[in-house]
Structure formats: C-alpha cells, structure tokens
C-alpha cells in the first residue's frame, strides 16, 4: 500500500513519522517526501496500509490516504522503459498520481485503476512479492 501523509515542513517531522512507525514494528519499503511551502507530502510503501494509517492517526499525524499500488520491474539496461510503461497507461486513460521506487529497485505506481494497469503492463511484472 502507498501511505500518503501530510507533514509539517519543519525539522524533525520525518524523524517523528519514522520513529512512530518503527516503534509499531512497521517497515517502510520505499517512498519519498516532497516539500512545498509549509507542508510536505510523504508517500511510503507499507505492507499493511490500514494498520500504518491507524498508528499514525493515533499519534496525531495527518494521513491523507492508504492506497493499493501497482508494482513493476523495469529493465534498467534498456533506455525508455519508464516512458513505455507511462505511455501504455496514458493510452488507456489511466492516470499516474504518484511514482517512486522501493528497496528492490521496483517501480511503485499509485494509479486510477490498479487492476486495469496491471493487465496492461504484464511484461513489467515484478518478480518479487511486494508489501
């Protein structure tokens, strides 16, 4: 699941998030944080989105959403893979809301329709199980 959290853009916000999840035994498998102005949008890959959201909300953090993701493995030796995946989805009107990679160098995509996106991109199926 993609866990979307809105943080204050201040020193220590990300540390707080990491400590809360760590104390709850929840591992972050990939993600990123993007700050604009006074807030920061954090997206992290977790195995149990509902539990992670509950833990963070109980600690007073703003969880925007926890969403199923599409996991794909790109051939890093072949230039243009990202463009090919994105073009395939765009041609079928599937919008990509968020994209990042995980600790296994897999592409993590938050899209409009995970099932349809998966059916359209079988050649990029990730080989490893994902959270």
Placement of each model-derived feature along the sequence:
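A conserved regulatory-domain signal marking ACT and ACT-like small-molecule sensing domains
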Residues: 1-131
